[in-house]
Regions:
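PLP-dependent amino-acid enzyme catalytic core
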Residues: 1-462
Length: 462
């Protein structure tokens, strides 16, 4: 299995090199040259299987021979051993034909744990074998950073620096990044919004002297391994609901498009997905684009679902690459236009996108009302991001086809919004009950590339 860049000018790589590289050297994102297929018999057999077994079946064809079977199984088993639910990703019925996929039973209470815990194990295995050390730099709108720090804290071959927008994430998200005591992890509170953090991250990857000098690696959802790990729970949940004999639809709250793109990959692999619904908050650039209005950046408006407060949706580039017939030159042109503010999608590419994705949006009042109603009618406490999905989903439900909405985070990660909507203060799990008492360790940094590079050089282990 080889991986190619969405911009067509970077060398093809193995899975291991793709994972350790992150962003391609031409600025593009890596995607597999071909999509492996999983037949109906194999999908049917997944019903009732342990999550780890399904994960091995789904991901193994993408990995090739860069990890042995024993190495890969070991990484999977260690990654999910610490999850707080035996099913790892349990389904809960909300309403007739509408299910919630709980993706918040990992160590940091968010769906990012499914990928990040696995990547931590894969990185450590590969780097130990190679005798190498890397510097991971990531940007987060809240959940990616805490998941990355949790996954890599204390590992011998990795230094981790996470950029997050100062004052624009929840207190729980911040404390999950700032309270670990291991010396190899660093939380950097940067001036600006998430798009600024993501832009500086890409600037660092495009500075090849810096990139090579510190052996830069990335674990944002630009990293293909992140997307791949998220493909698994589409298979596990669909099989539990009757796939392959029954089609299943999914509604995905998303800002950076990686989680819903994982669903698209599952569909391309042969999983009978009927509808993939992109659910956005008031920062609705993806909904506007998929509605035929072009992709044009605006001002990021802070919301109660901050992980979706994004204007530059990195993984959308992967969707555009396929929509434009895998034409790297066309994607490069679009990304150049995006630097100037935005672009229009060609008629043919838009038709392809709309063949695969539907979309909807939730206002702040919609989100709050959905949290209130869900508790009253179902007894479920929803985080604001999950509530965005639950609000959007009903318009896309069709009789006879189950709809699964991805519950992306535990409500206790956003206690203020949940309490304002319900009067209930969601409690953290017992293992995190002292989070608010732990001392914090963070560094304020400017939105300045030179200052960021200097800080990383000075504070990484040599």
């Amino acid at each position: 299995m080889r991986y190619i860049s969405t911009r067509g000018q970077a060398p093809a790589l193995t899975f291991e090199d793709t994972m350790l590289t992150g962003l391609a050297r031409d600025g593009g994102l890596y995607v597999p040259e071909t999509i492996p297929q999983i037949d109906a018999h194999t999908i049917a057999a997944m019903a009732g299987q342990p999550y780890e077994e399904i994960a091995y079946t789904v991901m193994r064809p993408f990995v090739g021979d860069t990890f042995s079977d024993a190495e890969f199984r070991g990484c999977i088993n260690r990654a999910y051993a610490g999850f707080g639910h035996a099913a790892r990703a349990p389904l809960v019925q909300l309403d007739q034909g509408h299910f919630l996929l709980e993706l918040f039973h990992g160590p940091t209470l968010a769906f990012k744990d499914f990928a990040m815990q696995l990547i931590g194990q894969l990185f450590q295995t590969a780097l130990a074998r190679r005798g190498e050390r890397v510097t991971i730099v990531g940007a987060t709108s809240g959940d990616t950073g805490s998941a990355a720090i949790e996954a890599f804290r204390g590992l011998e071959n990795v230094d981790v620096f996470i950029l997050y927008p100062h004052g624009r994430i929840s207190e729980v998200q911040r404390r999950q990044m700032t309270t670990p005591t291991e010396s190899n992890v660093h939380a950097l509170a940067m001036d600006g919004d998430f798009d600024d953090c993501q832009a500086r991250l890409k600037d660092m990857f495009n500075d090849f002297d810096f990139r090579d000098g510190v052996k830069l690696a990335g674990v944002n959802s630009i990293n293909w391994a992140r997307v791949l790990a998220q493909v698994v729970y589409y298979f596990s949940s669909a099989a539990a609901l009757g796939a392959p004999t029954r089609k299943v639809s999914f509604t995905v709250p998303t800002g950076n498009f990686g989680d819903v793109f994982a669903g698209y990959i599952a569909k391309r692999m042969g999983l009978p997905i009927d509808r993939l619904v992109v659910a956005t908050n008031q920062n609705d650039i993806l909904h506007r684009c998929l509605s035929g209005q072009g992709y044009h950046k605006g001002e990021t408006i802070p919301s109660i679902s901050p992980s979706m407060d994004i204007q530059v949706s990195s993984n959308f580039e992967r969707a555009l690459f396929d929509a434009y017939g895998r034409d790297g030159n066309a994607v490069t042109q679009l990304m150049d236009e995006l630097k100037a503010g935005g672009f229009e999608v060609s008629q043919g590419a838009m038709q392809d996108l709309q063949d695969h994705y539907e979309s909807g949006r939730a206002s702040e009042s919609d989100t709050t009302a959905t949290i209130t109603r869900a508790l009253a009618e179902t007894g479920e406490l929803l985080c604001p991001h999950s509530a965005v999905g639950v609000h959007v989903a009903p318009d896309h439900i069709h009789a006879g086809t189950p709809m699964v909405t991805l519950a992306t985070a535990h409500p206790a990660k956003f206690p203020d919004a949940v309490e304002a909507a319900t009067g209930v203060h969601p409690a953290l799990p017992p293992r995190m009950s002292d989070l608010y008492e732990r001392p914090e360790r963070l560094t304020r940094v400017p939105n300045d590339l030179a200052a960021l590079k200097a800080h990383i050089k000075e504070n990484r282990a040599t």
